[in-house]
From Swiss-Prot:
Residues 38-425 are cytoplasmic. The lineage of its organism: Eukaryota, Metazoa, Chordata, Craniata, Vertebrata. Ca(2+) binds at residues 246, 249, 252. This is Synaptotagmin-4. It comes from Mus musculus (Mouse). The gene is Syt4. GO terms for biological process: cell differentiation; dense core granule cytoskeletal transport; memory; negative regulation of catecholamine secretion; negative regulation of dense core granule exocytosis; negative regulation of neurotransmitter secretion; negative regulation of protein secretion; negative regulation of retrograde trans-synaptic signaling by neuropeptide.
């Protein structure tokens, strides 16, 4: 019988054909994947920013020229300009304030000097802004000053506002502050910085860097918030808190500035503003509020169950609105803290409901030396949290705290809940 040679040739050609088709398929797949990636990248670059606040920090000087020297916000003093020649600016810093919103530098003007942006403001522009700030409408929107606050003189804040319609970006530039009081009695100076909050949401808080030992700090920092429609700007307010950094204790509050944006037109370009810093209006009630807690001592397991239930009538932290309270629970044995817990933060409410349970291990013989401290704090993102009120339960505690603790010891295995008035922290 003759051999079948034809079928063998056909079987030998099949792997070659399959290999060719596989190579073409691989090249097509890689090309298709690369094309899809390019399309996604181009679509992502052309996509409009989402409706949310994003702050971008600009204009941070690495080496400020002279933090203690005063800078003129308006036009230069003519008497000083005539007597002194313009010196070249030899200090190294990032002049990011001169960039546009896209991050590009504008074309250089050979006629322009090397002075900073604050000194380039023309006297005419500052005069118009000053007239607007002193107009009756502006005086109505600005915070009124009492006679006592006018005598105290806490300084002046200089800033600028701008809106970019193409990017839907709201730009706030904190330029400088002048004439701040000395918070350090020894050095007769301050370490100032500024916190800014957008109201009424109170969700978006930013702050400048700390400038050391100066009463006339030049911040020149820009914060950009993208995705805000221009009509929504009229519903917002800007709250500035001027503070002095303290390394060893709570930062000192110098004063505050509140600027309602209703009636302010930003369609004509950048608007320069000056506002007097006034004494902080804490708007706190006579009391610190109340806290409802429930405790139970289990003698069989030597455990103390603490339930933080509710808080009510908590005072406002400041004019920026309601506080964001949470409770910190500290367990002490002979005046030494041996354990700590804390609840979740409740946003913008004077009447918070926590309902959170904590269990602490306690030896039975040392129950008389145990005390429980409750600290109600206001959550401040990016800074130290402020203590709203304090409560102590223990054998040596005064008032309702001592009575509540006595009931816990006398009636073990019973959950005992009581309201307590908070005292100063």
């Amino acid at each position: 019988m003759a051999p079948i040679t034809t079928s063998r040739v056909e079987f030998d050609e099949i792997p070659t054909v399959v290999g060719i088709f596989s190579a073409f398929g691989l090249v097509f797949t890689v090309s298709l994947f690369a094309w899809i990636c390019c399309q996604r990248r181009s679509a992502k670059s052309n996509k409009t920013p989402p409706y949310k606040f994003v702050h971008v920090l600009k204009g941070v000087d690495i080496y400020p020229e002279n933090l203690s020297s005063k800078k003129k916000f308006g036009g230069d003093d003519k008497s000083e300009v005539k007597g002194k020649a313009a010196l070249p600016n030899l200090s190294l810093h990032l002049d990011l304030e001169k960039r546009d919103l896209n991050g590009n530098f504008p074309k250089a003007n050979p006629k322009a000097g090397s002075s900073s942006d604050l000194e380039n403001v023309t006297p005419k522009l500052f005069t118009e802004t000053e007239k607007e700030a002193n107009s009756p409408e502006s005086l109505k929107s600005s915070t009124s000053l009492t006679s006592e606050e006018k005598q105290e003189k806490l300084g002046t804040l200089f800033l600028s506002l701008e809106y970019n319609f193409e990017k839907k970006a709201f730009v706030v530039n904190i330029k400088e502050a002048q004439g701040l009081p000395a918070m350090d009695e020894q050095s007769m100076t301050s370490d100032p910085y500024i916190k800014m909050t957008i109201l009424p949401e109170k969700k978006h808080r930013v702050k400048t860097r700390v400038l050391r030992k100066t009463l006339d700090p030049v911040f020149d920092e820009t914060f950009t918030f993208y995705g805000i429609p221009y009509p929504h700007i009229q519903e917002l307010s800007l709250h500035f808190t001027v503070l002095s950094f303290d390394r060893f204790s709570r930062d000192d509050v110098i004063g505050e500035v509140l600027i309602p944006l209703s009636g302010i037109e930003l369609s004509d370009g950048k608007m320069l503003m000056t506002r007097e810093i006034i004494k902080r209006n804490a708007k706190k009630s006579s009391g610190r509020g109340e806290l409802l807690v429930s405790l139970c001592y289990q003698s069989t397991t030597n455990t103390l169950t603490v339930v933080v239930l509710k808080a009510r009538h908590l005072p406002k932290s400041d004019v920026s609105g309601l506080s964001d309270p949470y409770v910190k629970v500290n367990l002490y044995h002979a005046k030494k803290r041996i354990s700590k817990k804390k609840t979740h933060v409740k946003k913008c409410t004077p009447n918070a409901v926590f309902n959170e349970l904590f269990v602490f291990d306690i030896p039975c013989e040392s129950l008389e030396e145990i005390s429980v401290e409750f600290l109600v704090l206001d959550s401040e993102r990016g800074s130290r949290n402020e203590v709203i009120g304090r409560l102590v339960l223990g054998a040596t505690a005064e008032g309702s705290g001592g009575g509540h603790w006595k009931e816990i010891c006398d009636f073990p295995r019973r959950q005992i809940a009581k309201w307590h008035m908070l005292c100063d922290g």
